[in-house]
Amino acid sequence: MSYLDNYIERIKNKGNRALADAINKTVSDIVPQYISNFSFRDHVVSLLVGDVQSGKTSHMFGLMCAAADEGFVNFVLLTTDNILLQQQTYKRAEKDLSDFCICDENDYLKFVQNNMKKPAVIVLKKNGRILKQWKNNLSSTNFVAGNPLFIVDDEADAASLNTKVNKNTQSTINKNLEEIKKTTTSSVYMEVTGTPQSILLQTVKSGWKPYFIYYFRPGKGYLGGNFFFPPEVPPYIVLTDNEEATDILNDEEFPENGLKVALVTHLLTSAHIMLSGGEVCNFLIHPSMKTDQHKGFAEKIGEYLNEILYSYEEDVTKSFFKSIYDKLKETKSKMVDFNEAYEYIIDQMKNDRISILVLNSFSSYEENTQYDKGLNILVGGNSLGRGVTFPQLQTIYYCRVAKSPQADTMWQHARMFGYDRDPDLMRVFMPPKLFKLFSDINRTNNIIIKQIENANNGNDIKIFYPTGLKPTRKNVLDKKSVGVYSGGVNYFPFYPVNKDINALDEILSAFENDIYSVNLKLITRILDLLDSETEDWNAKVFKGFINSMLAENPSAQGKLIIRRNRDIAKGTGTLLSPNDRKLGDEYKEEVVLTIYKVTGNKGWNGKQLWIPNIKLPGESVYYSGEGMPQDGSSKSNYQYDLKVDLDKVSESPASYCCNNKKNI
């Protein structure tokens, strides 16, 4: 049997046939087109996108097995710079890839002695010292240079990208990863993430722009963004006061609050799960990135537990539990008996079986991993993100709001996503402003996914968010190559080009000089026939934004304003008449394309032509990265040259970058 067959068989033997089928689909969609015909002389970058905690690792392992069947023998599996996650990944690889040689960070001798007898997987943290060490290790062997590396970068948007792209130099991790690729004559570098925003906005020149993108859908039973963060608040979200997190720690006599309700919710949920035969139930508290606040919240939870233990016989305490039990029954009708649950909780407390674990950089590896059995309350910050999984996580108290929120970072902290949860007993406690942010992120995530599925390899993905919410950290984006456009701003070309004025005349002949509601697809067809002599206005970019809206809603409408016989000078600093500007501004939530046909006087050499002015929906910021070349050239022409000219990393011209509030 092949490596892939063995892997799939092991999954089926565990009773997970649906997962096996999903992995087979991913493999059959990717391997024949991109792995089987690998040239063994190029360096190819690809992107595998899956929802947060949706089973990306299983699909990664499936693709690695399929690659081994195609002749790849040297694999590097990268994790974020987190001991817990690296060890979690290493142990899982040992278990799931039992016919591979699995190497830890200190297993160089094991790797060399294996000498390609089995496919080898080296599991490494993205740590500068570790990566440099393994770059030297790989270079020192006599079998790596002539055989391609298959590098799988889990959470590739974290640490791997060049954080100094705007300083004409290269960050340490990014440089080390590039040098690891250089240890061999060819490689496949598979970026894997649930938050691809920063990767989608990379340039081709950077070497991290994926040639192809694949999205795999989560399996049955997955609870993700659409479950927790639809446009309207679902019953699984419990809204807390926006300032509660600060007030709780500052006021020792703080009355009944969301944290206390969340704790009792966890206790009752745990009682139901454990009395129903379960082995674990977890409660996650994410208050801040500050470790002193982690300690403060852990102590506050301890105080609440002591209060319950001292007063459990009092009617007021039992009534408080009963009120929360009744709220849980609104979504979980078949709960265990209340009195039985209450007795179980008190027994667990009396016997000190409820664990409070603080997970942060000051905790040891052993302290950070004791949450797979029993009733656990986990408190932490950054250690709770990026790939660390918590079994049977049913209750979350999330109150961290960044001053300048980034969509990808926030989404990675959404540890409530996953499979092994009881959906009817899920509860997430958060303030309204956090729910709104998560809901906005979820909407854009769905639009990104639809673009990936609809586009040719997902090469031209457009991203937009409400003002104040950024897609990612700015230090990994080449500011000269990422277009930033503001909703509500009018954009038009100084020097417009009509590719085919007769075709434009024909399309627009059905419209008088007036305003019309039209399908956005018509606006994209008009944009196909327009351009600019210079790089001040890019029709493809605006078309890309509109296509992202159509991906969400194929019948989406926009406004088309037609004006003819306009006598406007070439290169004018303004285009719209005051009345048309006012008219367009009335439609704040729609795309507005105003198109003027000029007489040809005043610098146009007597030639009539159409001039477009486009306004994107307001209160949002739109981001455009650099698409892969689409000129019909073969794939091999667009592999990445690893001899990067670092003096020119940030000098590629922008298609158009404007983030102001005025016309140009």
What is the role of each PLM region?
Residues 56-65:
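Motif I (Walker A/P-loop) of helicase-class P-loop NTPases
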Residues 59, 72-96, 289:
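Conserved Walker A/P-loop ATP-binding site and its immediately adjacent core
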Residues 90, 99-101, 148-151, 276-377, ...:
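Conserved C-terminal RecA-like helicase domain
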Residues 105-152, 160-180, 380-381:
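Conserved RecA-like ASCE ATPase "motif II neighborhood" in helicase/translocase motors
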Residues 117-119, 147-153, 165-273, 282-284, ...:
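Conserved P-loop NTPase catalytic core
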Residues 256-282, 287-292, 447-552, 556:
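C-terminal catalytic or substrate-handling cores of phosphate/nucleotide-
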Residues 359-436:
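Conserved RecA-like P-loop NTPase helicase motor core
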Residues 401-425, 540-664:
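C-terminal accessory/interaction regions of large nucleic acid-associated machines
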